[in-house]
């Protein structure tokens, strides 16, 4: 009997990439596969996204793993390089990099490299995490244009902080800042990630950087990805390992936090926070068994959860349990837990098996 398994639908991944092509037809697509492709398996997902124009990762180790797996298309380090010692590896493996700090700029200026590196100057338009502040940006850009180790022209990128909140006004201000700086500069531009792709077509520019929507999950709190024509690629499943009679008034699990209001049948599912299921999931969080939703009862344990099957349940040991997937969206589970869908899909542990299918 299988226990915790994440079944990844390659057909859904390909569909989602094509959907982004439809939404941003004039832009190259940077398929963001960082954090193990948001829990979907970086190498397998990258090969499935073979029609993408390039790939985006957070760490040099991720880029090197892609190259070792035979990925030959451009790869950009979205956080940039972390040490001057990384620069020879960027040259050797033909990697592009964000440049967002004076330390990185100085490292590029001082390095002796066999050939220049393609860079993306990161402008801080309002995220205030990484990037060159607007008041220092012209001088920074000028130094990059004069650096012998930088492929010309210099490309420019930024990142939205509230693209999923169109009423906030923040994205308009960030775009205005970005446009003011990039005006007249010859390099490629990139500012839109998932939220920007969905809600801000004027931000698509030369490259878009889809992350979570590639995997069929929405970056928005109030809309599932299906609303925009995307298909969830992950189905997180396990199986019932016990079905038990349970009396009214009896508690379940650590701390006795849930008490049954009736005589019922409980199902014990072989999944827990040791597999990546959220420990914070409260009683009432739904799972899907034999086509119907049943609620979590009691606390999530390391290896198991307990669900209230109902007094007349006919479910049996070995029946499949869907924790989230196309028929029970991860966005709904996130709403129950207070965590984000990003967190849920990326927190799956090594104990959870990844399986790949080419399904409907």
From Swiss-Prot:
Alphabetically ordered keywords of this record: Isomerase, Pyridoxal phosphate
Residues of the active site: 34 (proton acceptor), 254 (proton acceptor)
Gene Ontology MF term list: alanine racemase activity; pyridoxal phosphate binding
Cellular component, GO annotation: cytosol
SUPFAM superfamilies linked: Alanine racemase C-terminal domain-like, PLP-binding barrel
Entries under Pfam families matching the protein: Ala_racemase_C, Ala_racemase_N
Record: residues binding substrate: 129, 302
Record-level GO BP terms: D-alanine biosynthetic process
UniProt catalytic activity: L-alanine = D-alanine
Cofactor(s) in the UniProt record: pyridoxal 5'-phosphate
Pathway membership, UniProt: Amino-acid biosynthesis; D-alanine biosynthesis; D-alanine from L-alanine: step 1/1
Known EC number: 5.1.1.1
Catalytic EC class: isomerase
Chain positions found as N6-(pyridoxal phosphate)lysine: 34
Keyword Oxidoreductase found: no
Function recorded in the entry: Catalyzes the interconversion of L-alanine and D-alanine. May also act on other amino acids.
Family named by the database record: Belongs to the alanine racemase family.
Name by which UniProt lists this protein: Alanine racemase
């Amino acid at each position: 009997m299988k226990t915790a398994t994440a079944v990844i639908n390659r057909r859904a991944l390909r569909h989602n990439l094509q959907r982004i092509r439809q939404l941003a037809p004039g832009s190259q697509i940077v398929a963001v596969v960082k954090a193990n492709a948001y829990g979907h398996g970086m190498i397998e997902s990258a090969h499935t996204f073979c029609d993408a124009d390039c790939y985006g990762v957070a760490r040099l180790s991720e880029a090197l793993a892609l190259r070792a797996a035979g990925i030959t298309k451009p790869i950009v380090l979205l956080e940039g390089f972390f040490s001057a010692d990384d620069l020879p590896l960027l040259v050797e493996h033909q990697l592009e990099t964000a440049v967002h700090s004076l330390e990185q700029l100085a490292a590029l200026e001082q390095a002796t490299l066999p050939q220049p590196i393609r860079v993306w100057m990161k402008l801080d338009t309002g995220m205030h995490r990484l990037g060159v502040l607007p008041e220092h940006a012209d001088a920074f850009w000028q130094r990059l244009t004069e650096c012998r180790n930088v492929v010309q022209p210099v490309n420019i990128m930024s990142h939205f902080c509230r693209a999923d909140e169109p009423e906030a006004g923040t994205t308009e201000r960030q775009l205005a800042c970005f446009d003011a700086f990039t005006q007249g500069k010859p390099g490629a531009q990139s500012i839109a990630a998932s939220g920007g792709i969905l809600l801000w077509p004027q931000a698509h520019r030369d490259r878009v950087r889809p992350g979570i929507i590639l995997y069929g999950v929405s970056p928005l709190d109030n809309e599932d990805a299906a609303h925009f024509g995307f298909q969830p690629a992950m189905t997180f499943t396990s199986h019932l390992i016990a079905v038990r009679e349970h009396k009214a008034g009896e508690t379940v699990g650590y701390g006795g936090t849930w008490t049954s209001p009736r005589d019922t049948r409980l199902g014990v599912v072989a999944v827990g926070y040791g597999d990546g299921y959220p420990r914070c999931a409260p009683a009432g969080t739904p799972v899907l068994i034999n086509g119907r939703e049943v609620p979590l009862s009691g606390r999530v344990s390391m290896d198991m959860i307990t669900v209230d099957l109902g007094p007349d349940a006919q479910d049996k040991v070995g029946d499949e349990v869907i924790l989230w997937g196309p028929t029970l969206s991860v966005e709904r589970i996130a709403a129950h837990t207070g965590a984000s869908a990003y967190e849920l899909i990326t927190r799956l542990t090594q104990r959870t098996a990844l399986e790949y299918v080419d399904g409907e």
